[in-house]
Design a protein with these regions (language model features):
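Conserved nucleotide-binding/hydrolysis micro-motifs of P-loop NTPases
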Residues: 74, 101-104, 130-133, 182-189, ...
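A glycine- and Lys/Arg-enriched "phosphate-lid" helix/loop adjacent to the NTP-binding pocket
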Residues: 28-29, 139-159, 169-221, 268-275
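NTP-dependent small-molecule kinase module
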Residues: 219-288
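Loop/turn-to-beta-strand initiation segments
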Residues: 63-64, 122-124, 173-177
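Pre-Walker A adenine-sensing motif
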Residues: 49-58
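Glycine-rich phosphate-binding P-loop
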Residues: 69-85
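Charged, amphipathic alpha-helical linker segments immediately N-terminal to NTP-binding catalytic cores
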Residues: 1-47
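Conserved nucleotide-sensing/catalytic segment adjacent to the nucleotide-binding pocket
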Residues: 28-42, 91-154
Length: 288
């Protein structure tokens, strides 16, 4: 997963990251169906390990995990969250999709509504889009700001705000994984056409999708700027090739699983008094 990781400021060029990485030569030779089958097996293995790791995360109550998914439209955020996180206990996980801010949210600073949703210890929080929209969509559409003519200093201050917030979160034992699902313009076109040609998928399409697609280059520049400004060792970005959904899901599931496992969590230790209670309860049940 090292090839996907970006953890140094000003080290990221979006054109240098593939959107259709096929992995090893062995994987490259596989047919689409065999590739999908192989990826599914790895995802299933990861799901089992992730479920066990999440149980320890919940039981130990020492860390929280924040997963951030950012991408262009049709990159597969929803499907990835669904497939990668399907095996975990829903009691220990919450997904948030941030829509247009409410009147109350607009009466606070721009990070307020995101801070309200940060996961508590023992839990996983998933942001399907996040506070990074404030330096992505808002940068492409500065008319959304009260001051529609921000200069570069304005954006640099926002990047600094985000870095400082993420530093505070990691010091407070929130582990942050930031995932940019890197889809190509041609693959986005293909997926849009698939939605338009499939009546059951019409609900996924918005006329705004085409308007935003016309700003592709602006968004790519905004992503590159944001990742360069906020990639740090404590809150790294992972740039995931997203043209093949199963490869993408396999990589994402591996990153999440390995990150939790790296915390080396253990079940809470039971006191001597509690051990006596457990022994007594066992004896009582065995007598029945």
């Amino acid at each position: 997963m090292k090839r996907c990781r970006v953890d140094k400021e000003n080290s990221f060029k979006i054109v240098e990251h593939e959107t259709s990485w096929e992995g090893t030569e062995e994987i490259h030779r596989l047919s689409e169906e065999k590739l999908k089958k192989k990826a599914r097996k790895i995802i299933e293995k990861n799901l089992k390990e992730l479920s066990e790791a999440q149980e320890l995360l919940y039981a130990s109550n020492k860390y929280s995990l924040l997963l951030i998914f950012q991408a262009m439209d049709a990159a597969g955020k929803d499907g990835t969250i669904k497939h990668v996180m399907s095996g975990i206990n829903p009691q220990g996980c919450e997904v948030y999709s941030f829509k247009k801010p409410s009147a109350e949210e607009l009466d606070h600073d721009y990070l307020w509504r995101y801070n309200k949703r940060m996961p508590e210890y023992g839990r996983i929080g998933i942001f399907n889009r996040s506070y990074y929209e404030e330096v992505l969509v808002v940068k492409v559409h500065p008319e959304l700001l009260s001051n529609p003519n921000p200069d570069e200093t304005f954006w640099n201050v926002r990047y600094e705000d985000i870095r400082n917030m993420e530093k505070h979160l990691t010091r407070s034992r929130t582990v942050i994984i930031k995932l940019f699902l890197n889809v190509s313009k041609e693959e986005q076109r293909r997926r849009f056409l698939e939605r338009l040609n499939t009546p059951a998928k019409h609900w996924k399409f918005s006329v705004n999708d085409l308007a935003e697609r016309k700003k592709w280059d602006d968004y790519q520049k905004a992503f590159e700027d944001a990742i360069n400004a906020t990639a740090t060792p404590w809150a790294p970005w992972y740039v995931i090739p997203a043209d093949n959904k199963w490869i993408m899901r396999m990589i994402v599931s591996t990153i999440i699983t390995e990150t939790i496992q790296s915390l080396n969590l253990e079940p809470p230790k039971v006191s001597d008094d509690m051990k006596k209670v457990i022994d007594e309860a066992r004896r009582e049940l065995e007598k029945e």
